[in-house]
């Protein structure tokens, strides 16, 4: 065999080995696990497009639902105008669909997954909120100690600790004192409200009196949990309570 064919064979195997190594050690999309060959970015082009779609809409700053800015009148939208809401305003990254939903589910099962991207989205939502300059404390929505022990961490606390603010501090003197059923297992708003009623409390010598507090959570569905948290914090003396969430689920206005 001449030298030229041997070189071609060597080149073929070398190229195949390089391709194999690239696939084996390649960066993967944090949502769908597709291989990403680009140097930067944590999402593939498809998941990135999905994320842009679900995070680009206008929303009501009172309830967080998808709504045109022209449908908001005197601070509320048609869906929340008659609702009793205890938090004063809300900021969100997007709606709980497609790649945003996938990243949040990954984040809830493994705190290392999607944390960087979700933290970036949360800080973007915070910077665009109506209450950025008012916050004294970030308060993560607490887990019951049994849930925290099983999971190993509170995803809301992980998120709160990555928020960028010149003055506000993260505080965990707001606790869950009663274990509740999963809100997603209940169909009606009434059931969800009843489920979380009296489930939260503040610790002795908490710092919330006269302060403005921002609750931090992953997903708002009916808002029952956030509402109960806000009610308890205001009963404890908080001057205002805001909410920051990664996503609002199934709440778009038709």
Show which residues each predicted segment covers.
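N-terminal juxtadomain amphipathic helix
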Residues: 2-99
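PRPP/pyrophosphate-binding module of the type I phosphoribosyltransferase fold
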Residues: 2-17, 22-29, 171-254
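Generic hydrophobic alpha-helical segments
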Residues: 47, 118, 122-126, 196-200
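Short, well-ordered alpha-helices that flank and scaffold nucleotide-derived cofactor binding pockets
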Residues: 49, 124, 161-165, 227, ...
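Arginine/glycine-rich "motif VI" loop of SF2 helicases in the C-terminal RecA-like domain
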Residues: 83-86, 165-166, 234-238
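ATP-binding/phosphotransfer module of carbohydrate and carboxylate kinases, centering on a glycine-rich
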Residues: 36, 128-133, 165, 251-253
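Extended interfacial segments that mediate partner engagement and assembly in macromolecular machines
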Residues: 56-162, 189
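A short coil-to-beta-strand element that immediately follows conserved catalytic motifs
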Residues: 87, 137, 167-175
């Amino acid at each position: 065999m001449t030298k030229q064919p041997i070189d071609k064979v060597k080149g073929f195997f070398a190229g195949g080995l390089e391709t194999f190594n690239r696939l084996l050690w390649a960066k993967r999309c944090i949502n769908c696990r597709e291989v990403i060959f680009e140097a930067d970015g944590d999402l593939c082009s498809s998941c990135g497009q999905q994320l842009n779609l679900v995070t680009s809409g206008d929303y009501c700053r009172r309830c967080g639902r998808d709504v045109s800015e022209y449908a908001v009148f005197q601070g509320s939208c048609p869906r929340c105008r008659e609702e009793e809401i205890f938090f004063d305003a809300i900021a969100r990254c997007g709606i709980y669909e497609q790649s945003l939903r996938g990243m949040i589910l990954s984040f809830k099962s493994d705190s290392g997954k999607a944390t960087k991207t979700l933290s970036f989205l949360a800080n973007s939502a915070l910077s665009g909120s109506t209450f950025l300059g008012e916050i004294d404390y970030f308060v993560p929505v607490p887990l019951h100690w049994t849930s925290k022990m099983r999971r190993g961490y509170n995803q809301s606390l992980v998120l709160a600790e990555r928020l960028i603010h010149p003055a506000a501090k993260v505080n965990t003197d707001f606790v869950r004192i009663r274990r509740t059923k999963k809100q997603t297992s209940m169909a009606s708003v009434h059931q969800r409200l009843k489920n979380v009623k009296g489930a939260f409390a503040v610790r002795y010598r908490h710092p919330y009196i006269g302060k403005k507090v921002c609750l931090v959570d992953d997903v708002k569905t009916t808002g029952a949990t956030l509402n109960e948290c806000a009610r308890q914090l205001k009963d404890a003396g908080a001057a205002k309570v805001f909410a920051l969430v990664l996503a609002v689920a199934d709440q778009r206005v038709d």
